[in-house]
Design a protein with these regions (language model features):
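Alpha-helical transmembrane segments
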Residues: 2-45, 80-111, 145-169, 190-377
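Membrane-interface helix-loop junction between the first two transmembrane segments
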Residues: 43-61
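Membrane-interfacial helix termini and the short, flexible loops that connect transmembrane helices
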Residues: 49, 118-127, 278-279
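Juxtamembrane helix-capping/reentrant segments at transmembrane boundaries
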Residues: 58-72, 126-137, 342, 347
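Short juxtamembrane and helix-loop transition motifs at transmembrane-helix boundaries
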Residues: 61-69, 101, 124, 178-186, ...
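Membrane-interfacial loop-to-helix junctions in multi-pass inner-membrane proteins
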Residues: 95-103, 122-137
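Alpha-helical transmembrane segments within multi-pass membrane transporters and channels
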Residues: 111-118
Length: 377
């Protein structure tokens, strides 16, 4: 909005507005706007949630130290969504389709999480949405994102080819080209791409959701992952850097740097109130929205295969649950004392703060390694 008004419309009359053309300037101010939105609106949201008695339910089989958190205001992801979307609308070029896809993902997955939280907290249904319903909505939202990207691929603004870490020239296409030209088979040509997009986005959304079990854990890791994605979006949209690093350059993709910057700022603002001991929890409305946004950005900048490194802690948390459930069903034995794995370390005697900070450190190491792979090819 400000880009359109102050740069495209008014900079001819007031040359200093030319600064709004610079992506780095708008990203920095999007981050700051998101941060201060979170800091200012946070107390209002916390107070309102308390007034409506929207508090967190703590399961009895969890660590006993967590029982004192019962009743802490939840559904704070509403604050995160506001702090992401408002700065993006203010500072991004709203003629850019990738920006709208990222915002759609945040809203769609946030709405799924909101419905889940609403049923659990307001209607006192312990499980919220059924697993089948939640997964169905997530898949539907991801398919819509995939279709939008296919449309952009037809117009030459997007590529369905994968960037494979550690390989310079290996870029397999997820569209079956010989079927794409067939009048009857062409819809099937895009099935591998659509399935892959669904896997990445739904997996990312649920992985962040599983990580959200300790004060500040998921949101701290989100700051790091979103920061790494901001670097990658900037490099992918910059002609010189993309050529030098042999990235798939898509000129319009750089505008997503502003969205990622807003995600970083909103996450830091939320962390101010979510740090141990937390004054507010994000709930599914926050974790699903953030995970969906992270997965969607990774798909759009062609770094889907790098996402397991960028969000390494999220992947480990999700794998710990999969392994625990699989082991118990197959062998009637548990691998961990409790899953997700952050609870395992709590039951080993680590304090909550120690688990959180060490997982943040691990997340930072994973993200730095992901960025170094750009040259390790």
């Amino acid at each position: 909005m400000l880009y359109w008004l102050l740069y495209l419309k008014l900079f001819h009359y007031f040359p200093p507005f030319r600064i709004f053309r610079y992506l780095t300037f708008r990203t920095a101010f999007a981050s700051l706007t998101a941060l201060f939105t979170g800091l200012i609106v946070g107390p209002i949201v916390i107070r309102r949630l308390r007034d409506f008695q929207i508090g967190q339910y703590i399961r009895e089989e969890g660590p006993q130290a967590h029982q004192k958190k019962a009743g802490t205001p939840t559904m704070g992801g509403l604050l995160i969504a506001i702090a992401i979307l408002v700065p993006t609308l203010l500072w991004a070029d709203l003629s850019n389709p990738f920006v709208w896809i990222a915002m759609f993902s945040t809203l769609a997955f946030g709405a799924i999480g909101f419905a889940d939280d609403y049923l659990k907290v307001v209607h006192h249904r312990n499980l919220g949405l059924t697993a089948r319903a939640k997964l169905g909505f997530q898949v539907a939202a991801s398919i819509m994102i995939a279709i939008a990207l296919i449309v952009l691929q037809h117009s030459g603004e997007y590529s369905t080819r994968l960037m494979v870490p550690f390989f310079k020239q290996f870029h397999p296409d997820l569209v079956i080209e010989r079927w794409a030209v067939h009048p009857q088979l062409w819809p099937l040509a895009f099935l591998p791409f659509v399935a892959f997009v669904v896997l990445v986005i739904v997996g990312s959304s649920n992985a962040v959701n599983l990580t959200d079990g300790l004060d500040g854990l998921a949101i701290g890791c989100t700051v790091i992952a979103a920061g790494a994605l901001a670097v990658l979006t900037y490099l992918s949209g910059h002609a010189t850097f993309a050529t030098y690093l042999e990235l798939q350059r898509m000129p319009q993709i750089g505008e997503l740097t502003i969205f990622c910057g807003a995600m970083v700022g909103s996450a830091i603002g939320f962390l101010w109130y979510n740090a141990h001991p937390a004054e507010i929890f994000m709930g599914d409305v926050g974790s699903l929205a953030l995970g969906g946004a992270i997965g969607t950005v990774a798909v759009m900048i062609k770094q889907e295969l790098l996402l397991p490194f960028i969000g390494g802690v999220f992947v480990i948390e999700a794998l710990s649950v999969i392994l625990q459930v699989g082991s118990y069903k197959l062998r009637k034995k548990r691998i961990f004392k409790m899953a997700p794995i952050h609870h395992h370390f709590e039951l080993l005697g680590w304090s909550e703060s120690k688990v959180i900070v060490r997982f943040w450190i691990a997340s930072l190491v994973f993200a730095l390694f992901a960025l170094t792979t750009l040259k390790l090819r």
